Amino acid sequence: MLRFLTLLLASSACAAAEFDCMIEARQTVEIRSSVEAVIESVKVTRGSFVAKGQVIVTLESGPERAALALAQGRAETQGDIKVSEARVGITRKKWQRAEELFKQNFISANARDEAEADFKLASEELQRARETQLLARLEAQRAAEVLALRTIRSPVNGVVVEVMRKAGEFGAITFKDPIMKLAEIDPLHVEAILPASMYGKVKRGQRAVVVPEAAIGGRYEIPVSIVDPVIDAASGTLGVRLELPNRKGAIPAGVRCRVQFL
């Protein structure tokens, strides 16, 4: 009975206690170019909400567009294949006719063999024409992929935190040059640092109430998503994370809060 009361009091103390926490972006992402190029346009500004896959930056791509058009033209050309197919059809008929004439002793074996050789040569030329077109299609695909690198898309649903480069700036950018920074804010991460004595009293999936600082307001009941399995020996603390849905982006990241575990 005494043990039960002790556990009950400990549980009540855990539920009643409040702890400081911080509301942070789920992740921040620096946008860079994978190719060296000059910025043609920046499609968003600081504070803009962006969707995953949305075009946010375009790079100058004149030569790449021309290369793609040329490769597509080669890939779509059917002239060589049609000529080769026609020649295969003609030489096949000649070879078949030569076989019949040879069986009737109207032509020599050499004449029959020449007709067969012409057919085989035409077949090989048709195969080469088809292989050439396949290579042209692969080249067109490669050119399309190279051109796609000139269009930069957002890797996340989020908000633009900072824009570092502008369209038309002198000189090409490289992968070392960040263009902009995005923050993913749905869901937000609520990070709390608890005393080590709370280990075992807060569990994954447990509900908690998060209250942002007064300037923001609101009260949100959300589950614990992570309880660090290792206690920081130097500070005697334990890290806990909760995920706060933020579909409309109404709650900013970087806000202090208080959390109470239920």
Model-inferred region functions:
Residues M1-L8:
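Sec-dependent signal peptide recognition
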Residues P187, G218-L262:
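Structural microfeature recognizing short secondary-structure transition sites
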